[in-house]
Amino acid sequence: MKLRANRVGEQMKKELGDIISRKIKDPRVGFVTVTDVQVSGDLQIATVYISVLGDEEQKESTLKGLAKAKGFIRSEIGQRIRLRKTPEISFEFDESIGYGHRIDTLLHEINKEGKREE
């Protein structure tokens, strides 16, 4: 069953990227990248992880815009993916990109310090 949830998640990720970039006209929704979709084993709940280009204020307004368009997004997903019941969608920020950037910065600083000591 987990395999099916993963396949549905990947398909939803692809469709959500298209829906958010092309169909949503809300000016609050900025440049959004869908980084991952986690679907529960019973296919009832989908957590969508997004990355937003901009500062904290833009991120919050994008999240509000997506929350407002949640019903439209869910109906579009229901039309594009044939499931008995379309999963309930929730949006969350993907912090892994910022975390990866922080690790990259720290490694770069360590590398600089190593060169200075030589």
UniProtKB/Swiss-Prot annotation:
Pfam families tied to this protein: RBFA (PF02033)
GO molecular function: ribosomal small subunit binding
GO terms (BP aspect): maturation of SSU-rRNA
PROSITE patterns per the UniProt record, alphabetical: RBFA (PS01319)
InterPro entries given in the database record: KH_dom-like_a/b (IPR015946), RbfA (IPR000238), RbfA_dom_sf (IPR023799), Ribosome-bd_factorA_CS (IPR020053)
Cellular localization per UniProt: Cytoplasm
Keywords for the protein's UniProt record, in alphabetical order: Cytoplasm, Ribosome biogenesis
Domain of life: Bacteria
Database matches in SUPFAM superfamilies: Ribosome-binding factor A, RbfA
GO CC entries: cytosol
The protein's assembly and partners: Monomer. Binds 30S ribosomal subunits, but not 50S ribosomal subunits or 70S ribosomes.
Cited function: One of several proteins that assist in the late maturation steps of the functional core of the 30S ribosomal subunit. Associates with free 30S ribosomal subunits (but not with 30S subunits that are part of 70S ribosomes or polysomes). Required for efficient processing of 16S rRNA. May interact with the 5'-terminal helix region of 16S rRNA.
Homology family: Belongs to the RbfA family.
NCBIfam families, per database record: rbfA
Name listed for the protein in its UniProt record: Ribosome-binding factor A
